[in-house]
Amino acid sequence: LAVLPNAPAMIHLSKGRKTLLDKRNRLLKQLLEKKTIDSSTYELAISEPLPDEPHALPQIAPYLVSRFYQERNGEYSRSTINKGIQTQVEDLAERWSNEFGRSDIRNLAILVIDIPSNQVVAYCGNVHFDRKQGGNQVDVIQAPRSTGSILKPFLYYAMLQEGSLLPDMLLPDVPVNINGFTPQNFSMQFEGAVPASEALARSLNIPAVTMLQRYGVPKFHSFLQQIGLKTINRSSSHYGLSLILGGAEATLWDVTNAYAMMGRSLLQLPQRSCSLLLPTSRITESTDPFQPGAVWQTFDALKEVNRPEEIDWKSIPSMQTIAWKTGTSYGFRDAWAVGVTPRYAVGVWVGNATGEGKPGLVGAQTAGPVLFDIFNLLPSSSWFTRPAGIFVEAEVCRKSGHLKGRFCDETDTLLVLPAGLRTEACPYHHLVTLSANESQRIYENCANTEPTLRKSWFTLPPVWEWYYKQHHPEYKPLPPFKAGCGEDTFQPMQFIYPPMNARIKLPKQLDGSKGFLTVELAHNNPNATVFWHLDETYQAQTQDFHKISLQPAAGKHSLTAVDGEGNTISTTFFVE
């Protein structure tokens, strides 16, 4: 100790040990020469080795420590963190960060909430706290980030709770243009119609936008604020329909808390923001935003989300049941994954804190594997118990997922929320009169001229049908009417693009000239011929694939299509 003050930064037990040993020995020699110590004491002292290097100070939960330092003003703080879980999560985050670093993905955040106690047990705000560049000093748990698809379960829940949706109700998955907003699925494919629960499990964008349009942006915006997403603080009109696809920003803290509250509703526990400090903060009065019945049905859909593993996880009894959801923001800037069991809610964010996008930054491919590695570290638990005394039985159409209609011939008796009994009965089953061999439809005025039969027929709108039958070979379009049997009031055509009153900007060609507009329709007769007219001027005819390119001038236009049977359909659009 006597020699350390001379150069404490250059010579200490962890640095310059040889120099330190020499200085100590010189001091002992001087003490001997001055007879401060005797020779035996000198020999004993000089033979002693230097003390071992001190262990590095622990760096557990550095981002949480930094947060407390900034927010607590030096006040004594005792956190809820479980040291064992925290260190395992930090080690896992370090390993995954090294893996992601090969793709120049530099940041990763993890939050683990114990649902029964409502306490945070692991808080990993980022990785590589010691690095001063690359955004590693940012506590991403508290940073607002684009939500991608991570909010879709909240919309699904809200519509179930309201009674405007049943879990397997068919939703459109076709090209849409809503005031210039043209959402696309991640796969860039369309399936015509998809059950709502499957659309959620597969995170299809077009059904989600259709749901939000039906539910209402202002109402959903208000609900998101009610469940604690504090950074969604602009007006609902600012976000519009993009709110469901990542048009808003939320923090990992708020999102994971909201999922944890869903879990707490099934455990019949109060729904409040989780705690970071012991003792737990004073309980405040609050209204529980989630009701267990609709949460149960939402988690039923989220259990079916495909896991990152290549194995058939559903066939392995020991695999823990987890309700989980991923999200990927526009431009591949943010990858999310949040999962819930009766014991834990885990939130993961992967990306670059600087906002830099990377092609492989997809929730299911990056944040998802991290999420399941964390659940593998945590104690497993059995699944939630279905809420009692909430659901009622209802007959539901097997094909459409709607309540049974007059002509539905295949139904299932399912448990639904009482509010679900207010939903629309199946609109897709119709009673039709057919020829004896079912090859033609017959009008009543012809029914007495030949043998006929009446049959229930599942029929989707033409555009839905066009895509649906490509994925469902069992789907049978309605047969055509028998010629000469009266006028067909059924409309066999529907425009895919443009929709009515669409406002369109034509692209420019490489040479600067005006580009083309591609128009398309669906016809339920695959052999039909369609004749196209723009502003009453004939343009072209099509067979099989009804799609043509036009080059209209700026202004208002009328597009008309006529098929070989005389059926006509028109739409109006504006070229800016």
What are these regions (language model features)?
Residues 65, 80, 103-133, 222-227:
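A short, well-structured edge-of-sheet supersecondary motif
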Residues 79-100, 112-114, 123, 131-140, ...:
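A penicillin-recognizing enzyme superfamily signal
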Residues 179, 322-576:
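Soluble, non-transmembrane domains of envelope/secretory-pathway proteins that act on or interact
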Residues 1-91, 124, 183-186, 222-225, ...:
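Non-catalytic, structured segments within soluble enzyme domains
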Residues 54-69, 165-220, 264, 279-304:
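Conserved catalytic neighborhood of penicillin-recognizing serine enzymes
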Residues 15, 19-30, 59, 63, ...:
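Extracytoplasmic/secreted proteins, especially bacterial periplasmic and envelope-associated proteins
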Residues 31, 89, 118, 137-171, ...:
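Active-site SXXK
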Residues 4-14, 69-76, 180, 198, ...:
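Substrate-binding clefts and substrate-entry loops adjacent to catalytic sites
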